[in-house]
Amino acid sequence: MMKSDEFVANVRKSAEDSFTSGLYCAESVVLALARAQGIESEILPKVATSFCGGMSRTCGTCGALTGAIMGVGLALGRSKAEESVAPSYAATQKLIKEFEQEFGSRECHVLLGCDLGTQEGQEMFREEGLRVQCTKFTGKAAEIAARIVSESNS
């Protein structure tokens, strides 16, 4: 069994590698967390696509964070109505709190300082190299989620 620190580092690297290879934030994070749990499916990045760019460029929650929430759900969520939501909810609340403490917000447009739903915002994103910031959000969201999942399973 992989040590917790190694598990967390591998998930972070996997998410960052997927992001720098062309997948977007939510896609990269959920895929990294799924693979770390031995889950392989082409459905996962598809499910996450519309969460990228702050909920499809609507100034919503950061896609890296929503991808991490989906990954937590894969590990701790329920598959039957009689199962408890408590483990997944508690882990998700902790994830959101830590992400907000780290970056000061959970909202894409606040984190980046631009609205990706506008032409001006997209130009600012490109011209100011803000994708580098998204790589950081992607890696950290994956790291926090992996640590929380690892702690919950130990």
Q: Can you name each region flagged by the protein language model?
A:
Residues 13-20, 52-59, 126-132:
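A short glycine/serine-rich beta->alpha loop
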Residues 1-21:
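Polybasic, low-complexity association/targeting segments
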Residues 51-70, 74:
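Glycine/serine-rich anion-binding loops at beta->alpha junctions
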Residues 2-5, 32-50, 114-119:
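Acidic-glycine-rich active-site phosphate/pyrophosphate-binding loop
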Residues 36-47, 74-94:
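Phosphate-handling active-site elements
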Residues 25, 62, 108:
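Short cysteine clusters
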Residues 3, 91-154:
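C-terminal binding/interaction regions
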